[in-house]
Amino acid sequence: MTRTYENFQYLENKVKVQGFKNGPLPLQSLLQRLCSGPCHLLLSLGLGLLLLVIICVVGFQNSKFQRDLVTLRTDFSNFTSNTVAEIQALTSQGSSLEETIASLKAEVEGFKQERQAGVSELQEHTTQKAHLGHCPHCPSVCVPVHSEMLLRVQQLVQDLKKLTCQVATLNNNASTEGTCCPVNWVEHQDSCYWFSHSGMSWAEAEKYCQLKNAHLVVINSREEQNFVQKYLGSAYTWMGLSDPEGAWKWVDGTDYATGFQNWKPGQPDDWQGHGLGGGEDCAHFHPDGRWNDDVCQRPYHWVCEAGLGQTSQESH
């Protein structure tokens, strides 16, 4: 072993001596000497690994690009579908609005004709009353007819005014807001009322009214109670009165204790035997108009109320 090492040392020294004699080795020859054997193999492996990394990076970027492209295509498709749906909805709404305007115009013309007929009939009765002023039986016959005709003409004038306002509102994009109620709302004493034909919980009904810039109806007087009662029908109907914290409160802040009340006998009783959990914290109208407390989750009809000009001009 010692002999072999000495021979290797001898050869190495000989190469160095020859190198110094012959001058520095060329760069290419030096690289070949340095990269021969295992070094050359490692360099090849390194280059192969680098190439593999580059291929992986390019493949990953291409895959990400493909996913982004699919996402963009999906988003564009959804956007196109939504846009088409919105255009169709707007077109349908425009057609419905045109039909509503046409219907209201027809009603206005009908009311104008009916009003004119009523005025003519009233004038005729007035003339007859003047001619028969000396008839002893005329007051008992003519006066009731005259009064009835006068009330009829006054009602026709009011209805015509409302319809004319609604047509102007629809034609002028709600520029007459504040002068009349929206279509399908009922005007009474400077307020607008909307009566539902389906059922919701008390909270859902109140939210619905709020979306129309209104609230569940608040009863302030016997006169308002009688007005609302005429439109109730046979269904239980929510009003804007509840006591979730143990004290009855109106949704608009009206004082409950000193205000008008119309409870059924023995109500409110906060009955808890219904099996639905909790008590009865929301008030509703019976078909006869009297009030009762019940579970707020029951799907009852409801009435929205708002000041004149505060409601949404959207038709229901």
Curated annotation (Swiss-Prot):
Question: Which residues does UniProt call coiled coil?
Answer: 85-176
Residue ranges that the UniProt entry lists as topological domain Cytoplasmic: 1-39
Residues annotated as binding Ca(2+) 2 are: V218, N220, E224, E305
Looking up PROSITE patterns in the UniProt record yields: C_TYPE_LECTIN_1 (PS00615), C_TYPE_LECTIN_2 (PS50041)
Protein name, UniProt field: C-type lectin domain family 10 member A
Q: Which gene encodes it?
A: CLEC10A
| Binding residues for Ca(2+) 3 | D243, D270, E280, D281
Major site of localization recorded for this protein: membrane
Give binding positions for a glycoprotein: Q267, D269, E280, H286, N292
CDD domains per record: CLECT_DC-SIGN_like
Instruction: Report a single Gene Ontology molecular function.
Output: fucose binding
Q: Which residues are glycosylated?
A: N78, N173
Q: How does it sit in the membrane?
A: Single-pass type II membrane protein
How is the subunit organization of this protein annotated in UniProt? Interacts with A-, B- and C-domain containing PTPRC/CD45 isoforms: isoform 1/CD45ABC, isoform 3/CD45AB, isoform 5/CD45BC and isoform 7/CD45B. Does not interact with PTPRC/CD45 isoform 2/CD45RO, a memory T cell marker.
Which residue ranges does the record assign to the C-type lectin domain? Answer: 188-305
Q: In which tissues is it expressed?
A: Expressed in myeloid antigen presenting cells in lymph nodes and skin (at protein level). Expressed in dermal dendritic cells (at protein level).
Q: Which UniProt keywords apply?
A: Adaptive immunity, Cell membrane, Coiled coil, Disulfide bond, Endocytosis, Endosome, Glycoprotein, Immunity, Innate immunity, Lectin, Lysosome, Membrane, Signal-anchor, Transmembrane, Transmembrane helix
The disulfide bridges present are C181-C192, C209-C304, C282-C296
